């Protein structure tokens, strides 16, 4: 008891004045990197990439403006609020006038100066390896399908149940295919199952368009385009984890007459009763504090756009180098897919999905849940009691506002082990949920 109290006091001290000082320096560093990246973008690509340091009314070209999160522009920064950003806005014009950009381009890229510039798939700060840009040959998501053989389907007269699996942040379809899929039956005594595990837009092997805002609407439309329409799904179930829960709920709400059940694991739910749910979500999932280290890293990546881009430049762009180093250090010939998936995104896709889905999606979740409940869709939610990524309060708040939602707290598990440490049980629970969701009664 004394040890626990002492630990809490130490954490409180660390997250006090030192925390304020560190994040004040981060405000300065992010402002400095804003200038640096604007200059480098001009040199490397002949244009300065837009960032979210400006007021949205000053600079936004996104048609679906309501799907952008307020957190993109309302992140507090001492130097931005003091008006220091004016210099960063004028930098491209200044450097062009004095000829610095032209000189550097001639020096660095002498053979490309007279060529017509064109839009490339990836930014200069993103990885351009064959694997990372393989998506340019398709406009649909990468989808892994598990189903009975065609011969079995043709012989059997059993109905087919379709299930769409949606992964969470910084993950891919392998989150499901390498774990739960092994324990899910393709066929049971009375039903055939067809499972679809997708790589969300901007993650895994799916497209990562640099012009996309990775809004909730864009994610849902890509799933519709890549899974529902091509496979003519007239009925299906949804299973989602973490960030994928927000997308899964939105997808189910759009097709509420077709969805039979929704299974959510560790959903980042933030009620929008008073408005401003997006900013409230950011304050909860990425609270500015130094301890524990995971929380500090999350806060740094979520609050500071240009620091985050710098981190992606170091780790994601050079992921092959880091993978070789990890293999040498760990004596492994093959790395776990979770490590490989961690860098399978661009800064654009990671940053905007974090803000426009996890934070921005909060203002739509209540409406989507109401739609599902009115349509009689069975909603099952579970979360580990040791989850430090998504507060356990999210579960109780959802249950409090929507009593029809079935919730379950799994003792001794966290954000990922709630599935990973109990894969067989989790799979069995899913099959049971699907079997009892045959008929819907609208409320």
Swiss-Prot record:
Q: What is its EC number?
A: 3.1.1.-
What is this enzyme's class at the first EC digit? hydrolase
GO:BP terms for this protein?
cell wall organization
Q: Which residues form the signal peptide?
A: 1-52
Location in the cell reads:
Cell membrane; Secreted, Cell wall
Q: Which UniProt keywords apply?
A: Cell membrane, Cell wall, Cell wall biogenesis/degradation, Hydrolase, Lipoprotein, Membrane, Palmitate, Secreted, Signal
Q: Which GO terms describe its molecular function?
A: hydrolase activity
* Residue intervals of the AB hydrolase-1 domain: 163-268
Cellular component terms per the entry's GO annotation: extracellular region; plasma membrane
Identify which residues the record assigns to the active site: 167, 242, 387, 415
Query: What Gene3D superfamilies does this protein map onto?
Result: alpha/beta hydrolase
The question of whether rRNA-binding is a record keyword is answered with no
Q: Lipid (N-palmitoyl cysteine) attached at which positions?
A: 53
Annotated membrane topology is: Lipid-anchor
Where does the source fall among the domains of life? Eukaryota
Listed PANTHER family = HYDROLASE, LYSOPHOSPHOLIPASE BODYGUARD 5-RELATED
Main role? Involved in cuticle development and morphogenesis.
In its UniProt entry, what is this protein called? Probable lysophospholipase BODYGUARD 5
Q: What lineage is this protein's organism placed in?
A: Eukaryota, Viridiplantae, Streptophyta, Embryophyta, Tracheophyta
Q: Which gene encodes it?
A: BDG5
